[in-house]
Structure formats: C-alpha cells, structure tokens
Amino acid sequence: SRCHRWADSPTGGSGPWGAESRAPELANGIEKAGFKIHNILTWKKNNCTPSQFYMKNCEFVIFCRKGKAKYINNIGDSKTVHEFNNISGKKVHPTEKPIELMKFYIENSSEENDTVLDPFMGSGSTGVACVNTFRNFIGFEIDENYFNIATKRIEEAQELNELL
C-alpha cells in the first residue's frame, strides 16, 4: 500500500516493465488502479543472443500516470522505440537493465532532486542511474540476495560520485 500511495502522487508517473506476453494483463491492472496509459515504450536491444526461437530483442515499458501529465524533458527524443545495447557477459539478475537505458528514461521523465520509486529493484540499475543523475531513490526487493547486490551497487555509485 505504501507503493500505491507513492504512485498516487498527483505529479507522479510510472513505468512498469513487462514481457510482451504479459502486456495486456499489465495494462489492465494499471488501468484498474486508476492510471492513464500514455505510451508503450520499446527498448530495442542492439546485441541480442540468437536462439532456436524468435529472438527477444525488445522489452516494453508502459508509460503511465495519475493526475496532471508531466511533459518529457527532451522533446527531440520523444519517439517510442529506443535502442540501447543489452548487458553483455554475465548479468547479476535475469532481467537486469543497462544503466544507460535507465538514465535515459529517468532524465527524460524527472528533474534533479526528484524521487524515483522502483518497487521491483532487482540488481539496482535504476538506483545507480538515479545516483548518476542526481535523483533520490527508493527501492524495494523481496529477494534478499538481489537486495544485497542492489544495495552494494548503489553504495558504490554513491562513493564514486563523491570522488568526482
């Protein structure tokens, strides 16, 4: 309920990630919670690994909000498909997002010193991106191992920023 109250902010936006197979269910839940869906944004992965099936070279985020809409910061980058490299090599979380991708969305939809909430923070990429873009961050993760990984990554980003 704390997450729901936070997301209920009159100026808050939301961007839950989901697989294309779950998009209708996710969109339905978002609308039932009273959010207005603005766009479905697509992350096109530039460096996917081939498989026996169609490659999963895209992931989707549903950009939605409650209350008054906030305009994005970089109108020149207002397209709905964005290309970023996937994380190559060993990931610390199965759905880990590149920090540059998260920085892009965070910088485009918030201001410095705003607070970003990630109720499913996984390995903490959103938190690291917030540190690197001077945003406050609140994250939740139910898996203790991933919580510890995320905490360590965010603390390391904070220490690095203090040195710069």
PLM features per residue range, with description:
Residues 151-164:
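S-adenosyl-L-methionine
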Residues 1-148:
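Core catalytic lobe of class I
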